[in-house]
Amino acid sequence: MTDFLNKLLSWYQSNARDFPFRQTTDPYLIWLSEVIMQQTRIEQGVPYYNSFVKVFPTVHDLAGASEEEVLKQWQGLGYYTRARNLHATANEIVEKYGGRFPENYENLRELKGVGDYTAAAIASVCFGQPHPVMDGNVIRFITRHFGITDAVDLAAAKKEIMEVLDELMENVQVLWEVSSATELLRPTIGLLPKSGKPLTSSLPRLTLTEASPSGDPAAVPDATEPSHNPFHPGLFNQAMIEFGATYCVPRNPNCRECIFNESCYALKYGMVDKLPLKKQQQALKSRYFHYLVISVRGKKGIYFRKRTENDIWKGLYEFPLIETSKPVTLPRLLNSIEWKQHFGKTPLKILSQTGSASHLLSHQKISATFYRLEIEKPSDKFGSLIHPKNIHELPVARIIEKYLETHQTSEL
């Protein structure tokens, strides 16, 4: 295990990508980065992270925001339950802990929306606690290298993966404590970054002297470990994720030049393209949305309604909607009970129909058709009539955002 760790952490120091959240151990910033990066590829998530930190630089700012403001900043990331949990957790941290994050894994795990992965990331990076993280990148790396051939979405395989990670983390903890106590483990030529790349640009700062973004020095966790010590639990976790994300990739990894090619089970037995093994994926559920883009003759704006039911996109705004169990033509839609419930004898004019647009979620496929309609008089039953200049302030799902991008709000 020591040889594995030496190779991994040496590789990380020389190859880690430089991201803003790798330059801090502030638990608020680490928490934000972990939640956001779970939604998207890290390169795509960095702009969201930067924007979020700019608008909500401290946990107090996030807690004091409205849910709509949070959802608007989250727009485009999907899975909006996480954004709502983020907001709720910020309020919990402010109200219950005075704005300071709990400093142990168990209390972090009790926070709303904070699972094993996020709690382990905060505990290890910010507080040096030996809790391994397990995401898709880590699972892929571990199953290939150590030869775990059970389906990874089953409990038995997850337990086996965590046992390997726990053993690795135990070794990290021992090496960290020894090196911190004796100061014998210093960077060697093999541990130094590539030429021209400063060490601090690729590793989290483990010794902080500045105040946190909130301006409160007390909010910065104590970190007395020397920044050059590679055997830090947080660095181990980040190295595992980084290697899986950039080297032990899902398809066509460069095994010939991999630093673990002599010890990798999957490479030895020709299973690189087969691991990690997964059981049959759940079939996608198809849903058919018919959006009614309603305006009022002689008035600027279109109607929006807020989704309040316990379904996808809760808390976001959308056009009035009719959902059907299968694709339907416009004549059939006009004769449906749902259409009559919406409009009854309300005079209206159908201006246009936009062809079906698709949007994939984790277990659902949304097929949406948009109908531009004009009614004679305003009606509260369709929601709120939003002026074009204010539409951009509403948090909306990506499928609505795409429609608005295609059809300029000034024309609506």
Outline where the language-model segments fall.
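Intrinsically disordered, low-complexity, charged terminal extensions of DNA damage-control enzymes
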Residues: M1-R17, Q23, V174-S180, T188-P204, ...
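Ser/Thr/Pro-rich, intrinsically disordered low-complexity segments
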Residues: L206-L208
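Catalytic cores of DNA base-excision repair glycosylases
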Residues: F4-K7, W11-S202, A211-P253, S263, ...
